[in-house]
């Protein structure tokens, strides 16, 4: 047909691609599914986590005589809040079983919380990662870091003299060496949809496939992250213009790399660092 379609959880031999475990898959694909309806995934300390819990019951019988337990834990697996809800869900329906209104604690450092849902005595469960940030931004920019938005002779002189430079380029100035940010992975086949969009004179998707990074890098000391894209990156990705780094050595890896599609296969970077003479340069082409 149209070419390679990089979709699906199983490969052509019905083997797991390793994208997700069977246990995690069943959290959202089973005869009973527990759902937390939340307006967002990122919160500030002292904010209220509000939402509701719903249960879909597609077993052969009414779901009754059981309790659903929800638990909010921090990154040390300490319980922040917890509650039990009795269930009475008719067969073939989904229903709201209770509200969520949790007062989040004040925190000094960003942290990942987890909201877990489970029905006692069963294997039915689900979980949602949440990112909690200090209510007030206490980040102090070190005096030895020079923040610039425009590349000029002064920036070159700073690096030549051994300074540290943090550069936020204006993407409009570098349109020929950037692509636009895309949070979700590109769908199906980049070449096919690119040609269709061009034919009907519609914007072409950036065509990228998410982020790749090392969570232990010092730049993430106050920003919890996985090695891959997750919801705390949404706003930054939508306001990013990853740089095309094809001219750099094969073994160079940006701090935050953007994975390109197999058709185009650029090396793309959203955050990258370089030694420039005796100086150090950190380039961030997204709005932090």
Regions found by a protein language model. Name each.
Residues 194-288:
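Catalytic beta-strand/loop cores that center a nucleophilic Ser/Cys/Thr
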Residues 47-88, 95-101, 110-120:
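Beta-strand-rich binding/interaction modules
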Residues 81-83, 126, 256, 270-271:
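A structural microfeature
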């Amino acid at each position: 047909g149209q070419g390679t379609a990089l979709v699906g959880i199983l490969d052509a031999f019905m083997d797991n691609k390793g994208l997700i475990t069977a246990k995690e898959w069943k959290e959202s694909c089973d005869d009973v599914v527990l759902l937390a309806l939340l307006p967002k995934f990122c919160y500030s300390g002292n904010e209220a986590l509000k939402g509701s819990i719903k249960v879909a019951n597609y077993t052969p019988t009414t779901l009754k005589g059981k309790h659903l337990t929800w638990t909010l834990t921090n990154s040390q697996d300490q319980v922040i809040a917890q509650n039990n809800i009795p269930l009475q869900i008719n067969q073939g329906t989904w229903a709201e079983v209770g509200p969520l209104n949790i007062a989040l604690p004040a925190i000094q450092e960003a942290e990942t919380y987890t909201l877990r849902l489970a029905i006692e005595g069963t294997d039915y469960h689900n979980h949602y990662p949440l990112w909690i940030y200090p209510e007030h931004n206490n980040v102090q920019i070190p005096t030895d870091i020079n923040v610039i938005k425009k590349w000029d002779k002064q920036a070159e002189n700073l690096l030549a003299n051994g300074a540290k430079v943090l550069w936020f380029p204006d993407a409009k100035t570098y349109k020929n060496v950037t692509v636009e940010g895309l949070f979700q992975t590109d769908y199906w086949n980049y070449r096919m949809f690119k040609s269709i969009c061009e034919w009907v004179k519609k914007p072409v998707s950036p065509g990228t496939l998410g982020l790749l990074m090392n969570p232990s890098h010092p730049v993430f000391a106050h920003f919890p992250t996985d090695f891959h894209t997750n919801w705390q990156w949404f706003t930054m990705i939508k306001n990013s213009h990853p740089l095309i780094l094809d001219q750099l050595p094969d073994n160079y890896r940006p701090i935050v790399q953007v994975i390109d599609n197999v058709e185009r296969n650029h090396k793309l970077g959203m955050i990258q660092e370089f030694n420039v003479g005796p100086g150090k340069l950190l380039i961030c082409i997204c709005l932090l």
